[in-house]
Amino acid sequence: MSIDRTQPLLPVTPVQPRETSDIAQQTRKPSAQSKTPVSGTEVKLSDAQAKLMQPGSQDINVERVETLKQAIRSGQLTMDTGKIADALLKNVADDLKNS
């Protein structure tokens, strides 16, 4: 295969922009639900779901995050790259076994 015999590239034809307001007006249909008032719907959450919805329940240890941020800023954060690599390799090996 010769490099000199390649076909010349043709210019791409430009795409004409559409008017988004015209498209939105054409596709928008009046909804019957928007005209009628919505009847009351009652939702009952389980205790576990209610606990998760409370603002005090966090799955992030904020104190640990702040400690790590300060260690990074001060340059005192040490990482065991060998341990990270071993865990990564173990994870990949487990994934390959399960595939």
Swiss-Prot record:
Matching InterPro entries: Anti-sigma-28_factor_FlgM_sf (IPR035890), FlgM (IPR007412), FlgM_C (IPR031316)
Keywords: Bacterial flagellum biogenesis, Repressor, Transcription, Transcription regulation
Polar residues bias spans: 22-39
Single Gene Ontology BP annotation: negative regulation of DNA-templated transcription
Keyword Transcription: yes
Highest rank taxon of the organism: Bacteria
Region Disordered: start-end pairs: 1-42
The family this protein is said to belong to: Belongs to the FlgM family.
Function as written in the Swiss-Prot or TrEMBL entry: Responsible for the coupling of flagellin expression to flagellar assembly by preventing expression of the flagellin genes when a component of the middle class of proteins is defective. It negatively regulates flagellar genes by inhibiting the activity of FliA by directly binding to FliA.
Listed name of the protein: Negative regulator of flagellin synthesis
